[in-house]
Amino acid sequence: MPERRTVALVTLGCARNEVDSEELAGRLAADGWDLVEDASDADVAVVNTCGFVEAAKKDSVDALLEANDLKDHGRTQAVVAVGCMAERYGKDLAEALPEADGVLGFDDYADISDRLQTILNGGIHASHTPRDRRKLLPISPAERQDTAVALPGHAQEAPAPAPEDLPEGVAPVSGPRAPLRRRLGTSPVASVKLASGCDRRCSFCAIPSFRGSFISRRPSDVLQETRWLAEQGVKEVMLVSENNTSYGKDLGDIRLLETLLPELADVDGIERIRVSYLQPAEMRPGLIDVLTSTPKVAPYFDLSFQHSAPGVLRAMRRFGDTDRFLELLDTIRSKAPQAGARSNFIVGFPGETEADLAELERFLTGARLDAIGVFGYSDEEGTEAVGYENKLDADTIAERLAHISQLAEELTSQRAEERVGETLQVLVESVESEEDGEVAIGRAAHQAPETDGQVVFTTREGLVPGLMVEAKAVGTEGVDLVAEHHELAEVAR
């Protein structure tokens, strides 16, 4: 009988990375590895890193060092870096961080089991030389579907294992660009990749250089994966990619998302479909209509504004201004008054003036966003903005970050207060123990996992994870809502 091999996956970063980890888990489980939750119980600890901004990279390095410490006591024998930071820096990361026994890029994912076994046996797998992955795909989007470039979340052209040959809980390969997958956890919410990469050239962003150009997954693969997730008990699916508004452009139909969403909403067992990562400049009336009027599709708009001062946006290689962005939000709310809206912003961008900051404040005050993320600008090697003049000093960036973050906290708390009295459809996600008993936690249509607020129920009576219930918002705790389960609210009347 083969010796038991155990592996733990530690995931940092965004929902796209979570999907990649579940792909790696599926590949490893299909090849006989036992997945464990705690890295201290694993022969190999695989850290799925994030390479987005400096703080995320630091967190990734810290996680690798923490995993390395486990080798001094307990079962752990090897630590391996995967993910965006590993792909972005390759052998440079391996040289800078000898504590990692291996640094694997996206091209290694299809052979992840063999790679880990080699490392576990004391062998060495040479790390890749970093390269610009945008150059691996044709310039024309229409020519990208037939390429054989490794794309996390998209299986390659390979013979599909028979379902009976796969361990329980592993999704079978459904064809080209639909990966093996094994769920890591029991949450009633799961992400599904619509696409990989990005064709935009924002001057501050390095993501396209290591995630590559934009390429869509085929609708049939997205549907099959969603059906499988429903069979696993998932109630809400969140569609993720670097830019969901571009979905279908390489498949000959830029409006493919408008067609796909109703089909996903019709999958048996799925209670909610949520779309994330939308570009304001690419929003179109038909997409807004589908997002605001399709049953089971959340009227939720994760819009990547980044700033609202025209001069700053131009320097970012982006489009828009305060008034056009406010008009977009007005259009959305005219169709769905309770629609959720969130965004992220960068402050302290090179050349940003006090007037630009005031313009951003004007937008934030008028936008009534449910959730706001604020980041201070930092240079990312390989981006256009690194060479910009008129850079702000670190103290000024820190001051502006603190100021806008405080404003964002106040505004999102006010927005939560505006929602008191609303009737909400809430997906119960967990029941947690507190000093005075158990409390049920969920999220309404305007609240995405991890990044946004949540709903705290006044009682957990009759509530279990995975249940979709109607509730009335009766109070707030910062950006979170306090709500009564609808049946209890009726009794109270």
UniProtKB/Swiss-Prot annotation:
Its EC number is 2.8.4.4. GO terms for biological process: tRNA modification. It comes from the Bacteria. Residues 5-121 form the MTTase N-terminal domain. It is an enzyme of class 2 (transferase). Residues 184-415 form the Radical SAM core domain. Keywords: 4Fe-4S, Cytoplasm, Iron, Iron-sulfur, Metal-binding, S-adenosyl-L-methionine, Transferase. One of its GO terms (molecular function) is aspartic acid methylthiotransferase activity. InterPro entries: Elp3/MiaA/NifB-like_rSAM, Methylthiotransferase, Methylthiotransferase_CS, Methylthiotransferase_N, Methylthiotransferase_N_sf, NA-bd_OB-fold, Ribosomal_uS12_MeSTrfase_RimO, rSAM. [4Fe-4S] cluster 2 binds at C198, C202, C205. Residues 417-487 form the TRAM domain. Its main location: cytoplasm. HAMAP family: MTTase_RimO. This is Ribosomal protein uS12 methylthiotransferase RimO. It comes from Streptomyces griseus subsp. griseus (strain JCM 4626 / CBS 651.72 / NBRC 13350 / KCC S-0626 / ISP 5235).
